[in-house]
Curated annotation (Swiss-Prot):
Signal sequence region: none
Family note: Belongs to the RHS family.
UniProt function note: Rhs elements have a nonessential function. They may play an important role in the natural ecology of the cell.
A Pfam cross-reference name: RHS
Compositional bias segments (type: Basic and acidic residues): 348-360
Protein name: Putative protein RhsE
Gene from which the chain derives: rhsE
Region (Disordered): 348-372
Amino acid sequence: MSTRLTTLSHTSEGHRVSVHYGYDDKGRLTGERQTVENPETGELLWHHETGHAYNEQGLANRVTPDSLPPVEWLTYGSGYLAGMKLGGTPLLEFTRDRLHRETVRSFGSMAGSNAAYKLTSTYTPAGQLQSQHLNSLVYDRDYGWNDNGDLVRISGPRQTREYGYSATGRLESVRTLAPDLDIRIPYATDPAGNRLPDPELHPDSTLTVWPDNRIAEDAHYVYRHDEYGRLTEKTDRIPAGVIRTDDERTHHYHYDSQHRLVFYTRIQHGEPLVESRYLYDPLGRRMAKRVWRRERDLTGWMSLSRKPEVTWYGWDGDRLTTVQTDTTRIQTVYEPGSFTPLIRVETENGEREKAQRRSLAETLQQEGSENGHGVVFPAELVRLLDRLEEEIRADRVSSESRAWLAQCGLTVEQLARQVEPEYTPARKVHFYHCDHRGLPLALISEDGNTAWRGEYDEWGNQLNEENPHHLHQPYRLPGQQHDEESGLYYNRHRHYDPLQGRYITPDPIGLRGGWNMYQYPLNPIQVIDPMGLDAIENMTSGGLIYAVSGVPGLIAANSITNSAYQFGYDMDAIVGGAHNGAADAMRHCYLMCRMTKTFGSTIADVIGKNHEAAGDRQGQPAKERIMDLKNNTVGIACGDFSAKCSDACIEKYNTGQLFGLDGIKADNPIKAKQGSSDASNY
């Protein structure tokens, strides 16, 4: 009996919202379908479906977005990405070095040496991203790093940005250098990471900490929170000495029982300027938004529009892949295993309507009865007809299908006349040119021209935009989508305020996401939070992203890292030494052992060295890094020669082959039975 989840359903803002899953005979996900219905009439308001397929090695190498041709990932080895096809047409090619790191990325109708878009990447000896050079010089970037693994400089043809950090690794300042320009922006925070008044602009400020991590005011707004710590009101701040005219605007935020933003309004002079309502599925993903804007009616009065602007959203797992309005549909294909957008496909709704057709099964069911009411075929018959239709359209009808038709007294020619002709809608395809984090900087057309470009600060605020073709580009930092009506960025589980560089509600996973439950990563240059839950570290250090590229790489590396920390916690409960002691040494050993088994000793060594470089901090013992690297070396050897990493690292501890600041003596050796209950989980 199958115990796989097939359907989830709930009511959101008066709508029945459901998610349906399909699986193959091996239990792998083959499809996800999202629906929104009017609960009173049963009318289907929104439908979105994504299909998945796998190759013989079990890698997810094919995805079929809703109403688009299949996307095929071309891979080699254990899943390293070599290219991408859309509906059989090659769009992207990747060249990699001997460590499987991406060195060249080409896009366009002639992908390869004559590609319209060609991005070349180089790396430092430590595996950090060193440069990204494009065949259009305006987007060239060179990266500079310090000895601690911090990104301290990004240089381009137009400007250079230099980054300063605190002793705890927080972004402390940004200096922008360009011809006739030298600007330094400081970022002051309290110990918990909350923004404080700029000491250069407000030298008289005595504020040193925000109680409960709730910012009450800044240079632009006054804020109010409810008993749950959720932002409920934001009002324009009137500077001291300015005469009040009661024209300040107030933003109001309302939430459901799951602390999700469901209603937003902006009011001025007691009248609403804009209102919006948000709809979520059972997994908390936003499925739709409705926006009413203030406009002049037929009588000349200004009031909210009667008919809202409706936007529908479609998802593939936790990644937003479809944005549909009343006029167009925008679909995004991401880099495998990441939140970095790769390809943008836009289709006008009129073109989509022309492409709508009945399947062969639907045609036969609708025309299969004399009374005109149609018939319902069994599911197995529908599958047979769907397969037959694919074969007819490809002009490759199998002998099996011909034999089946003969048994039914039918011919291929008879069924072919029932197949409705296909219409291929006109689509605009663009490539996302992103920064090292995955924030889009430009949209490149297939002929290599820039159709859109944007400039952002380190926290995702848009500083400048060139948009001659009026393209809608809502994506910001990985996992974020800009809402024009509120100025907020929807970030999967929460909403992010880019002006404050933090979330407007506490972290739904509590302290697992950090001590400050409003905090976005305090080093947004190298750390991202695509889920609105917790940070993903070492995004540019070479520790993960640039060492373990490929379809399974990032996911596998993150999973191994999490397992290593859990292994360390369990060993600490037995022998202690979670910091610079026995448990810490076993954690390093286990981490490198698992990385070696998964990626090989060369890449494991790169990951280990850059993990230590990124973790260096002011005031740490001088021997700490040497100790960790020695334990890493032991772990790499275990990965090459041992069957099970947990057992191997416990044995290294028991025999005194691991390293601590003050030495490690196995005065309390871990017995086989004592460690097996914990170690068996790894």
